[in-house]
């Protein structure tokens, strides 16, 4: 216990000059970093298509199985607020490697769990330490020469988005062939392997902020209060991610109950969402052309339309409409996120890491809300009501977006 005050109150030593650490990254190294981000963040989404299997296996009531997804995302949000700021205090390579080892242990705990309590606790641990992805991305940015930084970070972010999109079909297919516990055994092994690879590949990096951890944490509420862009963009993404998780937590239940889909069928359906990652580069190009604000509106409208289509798909018993809804919704959520991150990255560089963490935490707070609501609403009132609640979340974001237009004289990202 005596070590905790030291971490909280002791400023870090003055590090070596930052410029000395820049080097040319090889394509192989960049690819490994992208894979590492994708595999780590995927752990947050593995359970979404599996709740129909895991809930009965653990004896969870149908109205409570949303907690299977929610606690992982709550853990991730807390990790963004508490773990990621440590990257401004502690040596980064050690922090990333230790976090990946903790994720591996949490995944092993999930695989071995025989009760809801142990499963939930292990899920929280996985989410908490999977926030290491938001340490690794700026770490890689630091390693890249300034002239190559945008390209390198773009590739790594593509890996992260690919992990988000491919997690659901991967876990569905493995669960169908080897059982749901195998998903977490396999991922635990992958996390330990990644920890070893990154320990060998990453150089040591000591942050140069000179700030104490407690001071960094105390600065977070002030950043929220003083940064209008963060508040607005955080609300947009919280509403979008709530709708996203309502859809993706509820649709496996719909497919199993109304369409008699097995896990292989659900895996094939979830592949539709993977195409959403293709929208990220398009969003970046729109932002580079100065279209951040209108493109945000297009993304919000697209998400609204997608969820209306999802309602119709349930009523008309149409898998084709549900696939169309999945394609549009995933693309819209990714576009909104990329545009929002670009707006945030344009803000003060000395606060960029904390602003990024706060923004992603807002998104996952909304996502956890959607995941928690979805199974209970689906159980009590069906797909139509659930999808309409998703429509309302996106509508709330649209209302805030439209409220900006009377103030055209004031430029906002």
Question: For each of these PLM feature ranges, what is it?
Answer:
Residues 80-91, 279-292, 378:
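Helix-to-loop junctions at the C-terminal end of transmembrane segments
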Residues 15-24, 202-235:
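Juxtamembrane intracellular "pre-TM" segments in multi-pass secondary transporters
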Residues 346-383, 389-390:
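A late C-terminal transmembrane helix in Major Facilitator Superfamily
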Residues 293-340:
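C-terminal transmembrane helical hairpin of 12-TM major facilitator-type secondary transporters
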Residues 122-160:
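Cytoplasmic helix-loop-helix junction between adjacent transmembrane helices
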Residues 94-108, 188, 294-309, 391:
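Structural signature of the two symmetry-related core transmembrane helices
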Residues 78-116:
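Conserved MFS/SLC helix-loop-helix module at the cytosolic interface between two early adjacent transmembrane helices
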Residues 118, 148, 154-202:
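Helix-loop-helix hairpin linking two adjacent transmembrane segments in secondary transporters
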């Amino acid at each position: 216990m005596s070590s905790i005050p030291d971490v909280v109150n002791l400023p870090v030593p003055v590090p070596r000059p930052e410029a000395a650490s820049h080097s040319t990254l090889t394509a192989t190294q960049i690819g490994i970093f992208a894979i590492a981000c994708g595999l780590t963040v995927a752990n947050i989404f593995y359970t979404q298509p599996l709740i129909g299997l895991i809930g009965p296996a653990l004896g969870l009531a149908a109205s409570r199985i949303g907690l299977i997804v929610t606690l992982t995302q709550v853990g991730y949000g807390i990790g963004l607020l508490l773990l990621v700021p440590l990257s401004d205090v502690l040596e980064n390579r050690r922090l990333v490697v230790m976090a990946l080892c903790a994720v591996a242990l949490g995944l092993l705990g999930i695989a071995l769990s025989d009760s809801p309590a142990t499963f939930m606790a292990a899920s929280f641990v996985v989410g908490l330490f999977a926030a290491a992805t938001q340490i690794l991305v700026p770490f890689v940015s630091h390693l890249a020469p300034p002239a190559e930084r945008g390209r390198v970070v773009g590739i790594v972010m593509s890996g992260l988005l690919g992990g988000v999109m491919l997690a659901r079909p991967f876990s569905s297919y493995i669960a169908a062939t080897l059982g749901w516990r195998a998903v977490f055994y396999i991922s635990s092994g992958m996390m330990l392997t990644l920890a070893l690879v990154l320990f060998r590949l990453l150089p040591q990096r000591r942050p140069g902020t000179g700030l104490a951890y407690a001071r960094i944490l105390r600065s977070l509420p002030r950043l929220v209060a003083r940064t209008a862009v963060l508040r607005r963009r955080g609300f947009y993404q919280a509403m979008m991610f709530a709708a996203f998780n309502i859809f993706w937590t509820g649709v496996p239940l719909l497919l199993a109950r109304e369409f008699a889909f097995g896990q292989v069928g659900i895996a094939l359906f979830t592949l539709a969402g993977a195409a959403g990652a293709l929208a990220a580069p398009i969003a970046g190009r729109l932002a580079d052309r100065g279209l951040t604000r209108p493109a945000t509106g297009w993304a919000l409208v697209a998400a609204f339309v997608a969820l209306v289509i999802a309602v119709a798909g349930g009523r008309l018993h149409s898998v084709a409409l549900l696939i169309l809804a999945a394609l549009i919704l995933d693309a819209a959520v990714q576009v909104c996120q990329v545009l929002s991150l670009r707006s945030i990255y344009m803000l003060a560089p000395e606060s960029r890491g904390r602003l990024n963490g706060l923004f992603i935490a807002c998104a996952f707070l909304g996502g956890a809300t959607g995941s928690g609501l979805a199974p209970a609403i689906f159980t009590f009132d069906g797909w139509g009501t659930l999808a309409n609640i998703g429509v309302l979340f996106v509508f709330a974001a649209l209302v805030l977006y439209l409220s900006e237009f009377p103030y055209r004289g004031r430029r906002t990202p």
